[in-house]
């Protein structure tokens, strides 16, 4: 299994390194890969019963993108300027903590991840 996520907001980017709308549109690229696998693209086959396995099963990971300081409808997620380093692209300490929390919450609650992620050991 490969859990695929979008990237975080990039509206604060100060250079040409993946500014918006590229960061938002990246999510469509992820979605399209998953749709290709669902449609049976042999280059993305994960099931040995259907031929040579060439890829892992692609599943959605946590959705990390939100539109800056506009709260996301599903969970009120926002990204403030303080969540990014000076370049406006890479997460600062607060942005890293926010991302890590979203990822950890995902693995603790997703039905496909929870059984193996929460194993004591």
What do these predicted regions represent?
Residues 6-121:
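Catalytic His-Asp segment of secreted/periplasmic serine-dependent ester chemistry enzymes
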């Amino acid at each position: 299994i490969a859990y695929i996520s979008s990237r975080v907001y990039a509206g604060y980017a100060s250079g040409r390194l993946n500014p918006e709308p590229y960061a938002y549109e990246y999510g469509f690229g992820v979605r399209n890969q998953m749709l290709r696998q669902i449609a049976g693209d042999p280059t993305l086959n994960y099931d040995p019963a259907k031929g040579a396995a060439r890829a892992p099963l692609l599943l959605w990971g946590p959705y990390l993108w939100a539109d800056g300081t506009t709260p996301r409808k599903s969970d009120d997620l926002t990204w403030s300027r303080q969540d990014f380093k000076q370049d406006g692209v890479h997460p600062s300490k607060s942005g890293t903590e926010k991302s890590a929390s979203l990822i950890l919450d995902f693995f603790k609650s997703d039905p496909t991840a929870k059984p193996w992620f929460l194993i004591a050991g």
